[in-house]
Design a protein with these regions (language model features):
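Gram-negative/organellar outer-membrane beta-barrel architecture
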Residues: 1-92, 156-179
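C-terminal transmembrane beta-barrel domains of outer membrane proteins
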Residues: 17-24, 69-72, 89-189
């Protein structure tokens, strides 16, 4: 069970309450490669107050304030980092396909990530470059569910910015996210 609050800096105007279960299995297929497969059940309730972003309001009006999704996932990763917690050399690659073919919320997602860790000056420093792409689309006549929107900003995305603070906003400054995210960043340590 999870709850997500609005990413608006002006007011809390919506909340997502998600309950469900999922299971994912990862199977190594080579020294650095792993394949993942998973399935789950999610029920998401949207609680709203005044000032709701139009996309959220319209989604709730069209499909109700409660949606059920049956997410299926398939993924692959390649991890040649020399240390998974504090790497100084190597690469990490990930590709993931998500599909919810049944339930109220029907959608497909695709996400990918590439990281490279480059040792510098006799391994005293490391340069990390990172690229991430996330995309989602509704299936059939259904729009992409607003509770699956992508956000940027914060730890793991763009540091020095508040979590979810980058991206589209409505006239009230409410962060609504979107169905596409591109993140390119680097770190030197």
């Amino acid at each position: 069970y999870t709850t997500s609050k609005s990413l608006s800096s002006f007011a809390e105007v919506y909340e997502f309450a998600r309950e469900g279960a999922s299971i994912t299995f990862g199977v190594p297929i080579a020294e650095f490669d792993r394949v993942f497969i998973g399935a789950g059940y999610e029920r998401t309730r949207i609680t709203t107050t005044k000032g709701v972003p139009p996309t959220f309001y319209n989604f709730g009006e069209r499909f109700g304030r409660s949606s059920v999704a049956i997410p299926l996932t398939l993924g692959w990763s390649n991890d040649s980092r020399n240390n998974p917690l504090s790497p100084t050399a190597g690469e990490f690659k990930r590709l993931s396909l998500g599909l919810s073919p049944a339930g109220d919320a029907r959608y497909v997602t695709l996400s990918t990530q590439y990281q490279r860790f480059i040792p510098l000056w006799s391994n005293k420093f490391t340069l990390m470059v990172n690229g991430e792409l996330g995309w989602g689309e509704g299936l059939g006549s259904r729009p992409y569910p607003v509770f699956k929107n992508f956000y940027a900003g914060g730890l793991g995305s763009v540091r020095a910015f508040e979590g979810g603070s980058l991206g589209p906003t409505d006239n009230f400054g409410t962060r609504s996210g979107g169905n596409l995210r591109l993140n390119l960043n680097s770190e030197f340590y």
